[in-house]
Amino acid sequence: MLAGSLALAAPAPSSHAGASPAPSSGSRETAAEGCDEGPAACHGGVKWLYRYSYSLGVHPFTSPHEVRRQLTDHFWLFPVSGACPARIRPADECDLLGGNPVRVEAVGATRLQIATLPGHDLGDGLHIRFAFSRTFGFHYLVVSAWQDRPTRCTRSTPCAMASRAGAWALWKVLSATLAVSAYAA
């Protein structure tokens, strides 16, 4: 179905792992313990584990806020939503697919941020931000991740590489889903 959909795409900004944190912009609807500005503001400048950019195609009549709202109001669009509610809000805790617990840390006008909890396969204290933007009608999703402290997986090069590759593929599925659902936003 996704292959048959019409979506014009422009090249997204390059993706990179290990890049230095950059402050986010946009309004704060909800911040978790002052950490909504990312690792530079919260964790002494910890480097990103990854930062991937995806094009969602052309949606000239849809704002980044509407795309973010489409995801948080219809969380079943999230590829591994598991036992999470259909609509998520800040401070919600739920299990993603595979019994991986997360907490919704923040929901801003154009971003969603979650954190892994104890019992998650990747360890606790991993923060993942989904930020939405639009340039000349082209929408983009930037997914960034950082951690409070190294985990068993991030200390192991093969596991860390596999985790980043898996994240890239998973968020690619999310971006393809949002590229289609943004028409309904």
Regions found by a protein language model. Give the residues of each.
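Secretory targeting and sorting signals
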Residues: 1-19
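Hydrophobic-ligand binding "helix-grip"
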Residues: 98-135
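Hydrophobic ligand-binding cavity/cleft-lining segments
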Residues: 21-95
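Short, solvent-exposed aromatic-acidic interface loops
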Residues: 117-121, 143-156
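Structured segments of extracytoplasmic/periplasmic soluble domains
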Residues: 70-78, 135, 172, 176
